[in-house]
From Swiss-Prot:
InterPro entries: PUP_plant (IPR030182). It comes from Arabidopsis thaliana (Mouse-ear cress). It is found in: Membrane. The gene is PUP13. Keywords: Membrane, Transmembrane, Transmembrane helix, Transport. This is Probable purine permease 13.
Length: 361
């Protein structure tokens, strides 16, 4: 490798590597520390999202029926994030890189998008079977691939493309293996509304991830993880306000006491279910936002889709669901897709290291 090629590779690192590997603002971290943070974020996203989905199913199975409560619990657990935020250095870089007005606009716009997204997902799950819902949710990978390419200049290599395809196929296989049917009594119009809500929610979710990555890299330009928590706290606050307004405007709040009394497992379990769901969704969201900060929005979305494959394992352990051959094949395909993306990050790191060595010579 000559000197000119080495300079080109280093230039690619400064301009584009952070979109497929580690961001430029995190170059100060040792690679070992970076990988530890990535795997911790992956663990939070997959485990917390799986627990949240299981608790959500438990809520509906035991008599819960409020769409706005289902929307609210996805974001109202943000106060727990103030505890770790107290032990992190303040994100002073955000105040110097953009104005307070810009910060407010970012938090408001993303918060409203999250609130709308959560509501649409609640409607989709209400009108669709679990299998149809999961198939439509997997479309977020395709949307995110497009948004990442145009908004974040994500390099869509063959390995990344294979990763997206493998995870999508895996999610579809798991969904097809689910023998649940549409909710009884729903009309064709309700089914159509559920499909449209779920697809539109997947589009908004993918756009939201890409816009978060764009905000971190080009607007906030923060170098601290406190900004990750602040992003999650303030956007969740806005989304929670949207859900609370909807809860009172729709009149569902008047039925909550009856719903609690008629909950099959009792009032205490009802409250614990909602609290556990709120905390789980919040931890999962922190993992998702952290992966956007550490890697990219596309990677965060890939791991989120991977959790759709891990959730059946949790259902097997909790609800004693049957592990079929199709689910086993889907799990294998999902982990292969995950491996493709990890290997792409390894190749990117190796290329940068060789370029640095060539420049040093």
């Amino acid at each position: 490798m000559d000197e000119e090629e080495a300079m080109l590779l280093l230039k690619e690192e400064d301009e584009g590597t952070r979109r497929t590997s580690v961001p430029t603002q995190l170059m100060k971290l040792k690679r070992t520390h970076w990988w530890i943070l990535v795997f911790i974020s992956i663990f939070f996203l997959i485990s917390a999202q799986a627990i949240a989905v299981l608790l959500g199913r438990f809520y509906y199975n035991e008599g819960g029926n409020s769409k706005w409560i289902s929307t609210l619990v996805q974001t109202c657990g943000f106060p727990i994030l103030y505890l770790p935020l107290c032990f992190l250095p303040a994100s002073h870089s955000s105040s110097s890189s953009c104005s307070f007005k810009t910060l407010v606009w970012i938090y408001l716009s993303l918060g409203f998008a999250i609130g709308l997204d959560n509501l649409l997902y609640s409607f989709g799950l209400l009108y669709l079977s679990a299998s149809t819902y999961s198939i439509l949710c997997s479309s977020q990978l395709a949307f995110n691939g497009v948004f990442s390419y145009y908004i974040n200049s994500q390099k869509i290599t063959c390995l990344i493309l294979f990763s997206v395809l493998f995870l999508s196929v895996s999610a579809v296989l798991v969904s097809l293996d689910d023998d649940s049917n549409s909710p009884s009594g729903d009309s064709k119009w309700s089914y159509l509304i559920g499909c449209l809500c779920t697809v539109f929610a997947s589009l908004i979710y993918s756009l939201q991830l890409s816009l978060m990555q764009f905000s971190f890299e080009n607007v906030l330009k923060s170098e601290t993880f406190s900004m990750v928590l602040e992003m999650q706290i303030y956007t969740s606050l806005v989304a929670s306000c949207v859900a609370v307004i909807g809860l009172f405007a729709s009149g569902e709040w008047m039925l909550l006491s009856v719903e609690m009394e008629e909950f099959h497992e009792g009032q205490v379990i009802y409250v614990l279910t909602l609290v556990g769901t709120a905390v789980s969704w919040q931890l999962g969201s922190v993992g998702a936002v952290a992966l956007i900060f550490l890697v990219s929005s596309l990677f965060s979305n890939l791991i989120g889709t991977l959790s759709l494959i891990v959730t059946p394992l949790a259902a097997i352990a909790v609800f004693h669901d049957k592990l079929t051959e199709v689910k086993m094949v889907a799990m294998l395909i999902a982990f292969m897709g995950f491996g493709f993306y990890i290997y792409q990050n390894y190749l990117d790191d190796l290329k940068v290291q060789r370029a640095r060595e060539a420049q040093a010579e």
